[in-house]
């Protein structure tokens, strides 16, 4: 029988010897619902889903939430960056990243009655939930606002 693992932000030493928190980042590699235009998808995520979601995320300790919309216009820019090492273009429509300290907080948010009532069903309005993928990992930050930094600050 498998056992569940609880993961929280951990302290790790920085180059200066200070202890700093490590944060988790849930990345959702999203596809839009079949038949939906890129702009309708972006509009729903930015103007419908985000306003419904952001206060709930704050309530449960989310430190940062971003959406990166990968539309035809920006996909075309990739041709300027291709080289032998960077030549495979991702076809996802959006990358949504949620940063938090404690996975239990995120799990509690998903159990919130408001989340279940308003957000679970909303995903079916714009997302291809069968094709979209997810991953989670530790955040390592090196540059913020044009400045070198020693790790992510929540």
UniProtKB/Swiss-Prot annotation:
Domain of life (superkingdom): Eukaryota
Pfam families found in the cross-reference section: EthD
Stated induction or repression of this protein's expression: Expression is positively regulated by the transcriptional regulator wor1. Expression is down-regulated during biotrophic growth within tomato leaves.
Enzyme Commission identifier(s): 4.1.1.-
Keyword rRNA-binding applies: no
Enzyme class: lyase
Biological pathway: Pigment biosynthesis
Database matches in InterPro entries: Dimeric_a/b-barrel (IPR011008), EthD_dom (IPR009799)
Signal peptide from the UniProt entry: none
Family: Belongs to the tpcK family.
Reported function: Decarboxylase involved in the biosynthesis of the bianthraquinone cladofulvin, a conidial pigment not required for virulence but that plays a role in fitness and resistance to environmental stresses including UV light and low-temperature stress. The pathway begins with the synthesis of atrochrysone thioester by the polyketide synthase (PKS) claG. The atrochrysone carboxyl ACP thioesterase claF then breaks the thioester bond and releases the atrochrysone carboxylic acid from claG.
The protein's name in its UniProt record: Decarboxylase claH
